[in-house]
């Protein structure tokens, strides 16, 4: 049984504007030895539907994602760190980042906000003490968490999660075409394993994250629909599934870089791979200049 299933030493750290830089310094050290990162976001729902003609249902799903991510703001991000065996660092292993969000000024789905409020999110505190996304993006760029081939990202049905991450890191709207989105995604997050996509090869596993956790006999730490708790549970599910269904070895060619409900993701042209490498070098040079 992977150590990721041992609950007694797991700790979720709440991060607000006041302790952001201190916690990011810790993460820069942690990721050197614990480079498997389970991720989840909380966002204010779906508020618009795209109109027009679409090439396929997958194209429609991407356009639905794109128009909502462009309009809305991320509320929470959860990151849980383990090593390749599913073992946690001592002490804190999960960070829950709470971003600025204003119920008076920002757009949202009322049902989603009600769900998050009932799950314990403190929207008044988000408004007053939340993290500025631009400042967070600057710190994330230099954290060793993104743009690194050795870092493995674990997620669950994560098109929207990574949509918000790409928006946050680029400070711009998502690309109009899905293949352009995956090009940028693979630049920042070279290795992604979406647990919901992995479930396609896991007999009898079905449902959302909590249902899957129940089927795998996993115990949640923290509250459902909070990003830290959900990221922690996502990591647990990945390592349990890896052990039970994949004999502790997942075929990257089949699963890496694919997001459930969207296109193939990794089906990039070779010349795009060259462009991606050149873009990464440019970004790394920019980061190096920022650190000097």
UniProtKB/Swiss-Prot annotation:
Cell location: Cytoplasm; Nucleus
Gene3D superfamilies, per database record: Ribonuclease H-like superfamily/Ribonuclease H
GO process annotations (BP): miRNA-mediated gene silencing by mRNA destabilization; positive regulation of cell population proliferation; regulation of translation
Primary location group: cytoplasm
InterPro entries: CNOT7/CNOT8/Pop2, RNase_CAF1, RNaseH-like_sf, RNaseH_sf
Keyword line: Cytoplasm, Exonuclease, Hydrolase, Metal-binding, Nuclease, Nucleus, Repressor, RNA-binding, RNA-mediated gene silencing, Transcription, Transcription regulation, Translation regulation
Annotated binding of a divalent metal cation 2, by residue: 40, 42, 230
The keyword Transmembrane helix is annotated on this UniProt entry: no
Family, similarity comment: Belongs to the CAF1 family.
Function statement: Has 3'-5' poly(A) exoribonuclease activity for synthetic poly(A) RNA substrate. Its function seems to be partially redundant with that of CNOT7. Catalytic component of the CCR4-NOT complex which is linked to various cellular processes including bulk mRNA degradation, miRNA-mediated repression, translational repression during translational initiation and general transcription regulation. During miRNA-mediated repression the complex also seems to act as translational repressor during translational initiation. Additional complex functions may be a consequence of its influence on mRNA expression.
Protein name in UniProt: CCR4-NOT transcription complex subunit 8
Species per Swiss-Prot/TrEMBL record: Mus musculus
Lineage, opening ranks: Eukaryota, Metazoa, Chordata, Craniata, Vertebrata
């Amino acid at each position: 049984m992977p150590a990721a299933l041992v609950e007694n030493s797991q700790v979720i750290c709440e991060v607000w504007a006041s302790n952001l830089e201190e916690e990011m310094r810790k993460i820069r050290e942690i990721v050197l030895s614990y480079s498997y990162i389970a991720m989840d976001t909380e966002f204010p729902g779906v508020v618009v539907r795209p109109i027009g003609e679409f090439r396929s249902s997958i194209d429609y799903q991407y356009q639905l994602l794109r128009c909502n991510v462009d309009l809305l703001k991320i509320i929470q991000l959860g990151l849980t760190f383990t090593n390749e065996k599913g073992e946690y660092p001592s002490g804190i292993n999960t960070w829950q980042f709470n971003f600025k969000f204003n119920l008076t000024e920002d757009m949202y789905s009322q049902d989603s906000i009600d769900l998050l409020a009932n799950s314990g999110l403190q929207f008044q505190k988000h408004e007053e003490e939340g993290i500025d996304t631009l400042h967070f993006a600057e710190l994330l760029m230099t954290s060793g968490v993104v743009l690194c081939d050795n870092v493995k990202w674990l997620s669950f049905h994560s098109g929207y999660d990574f949509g918000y991450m790409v928006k946050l890191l680029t400070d711009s709207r998502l690309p109009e075409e899905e293949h352009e989105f995956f090009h940028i995604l693979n630049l920042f997050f070279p290795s992604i394993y979406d647990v919901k996509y992995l479930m396609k090869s896991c007999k009898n596993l079905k449902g959302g994250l909590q249902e899957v956790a129940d089927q795998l006999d996993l115990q949640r730490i923290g509250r459902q629909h909070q990003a830290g708790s959900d990221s922690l549970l996502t990591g647990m599910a990945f390592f349990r599934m890896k052990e039970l269904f994949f004999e502790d070895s997942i075929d990257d060619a089949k699963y890496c870089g694919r997001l459930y409900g969207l296109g193939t993701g990794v089906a990039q042209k070779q010349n795009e791979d060259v462009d991606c490498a050149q873009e990464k070098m440019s970004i790394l040079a920019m980061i190096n200049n920022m650190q000097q």
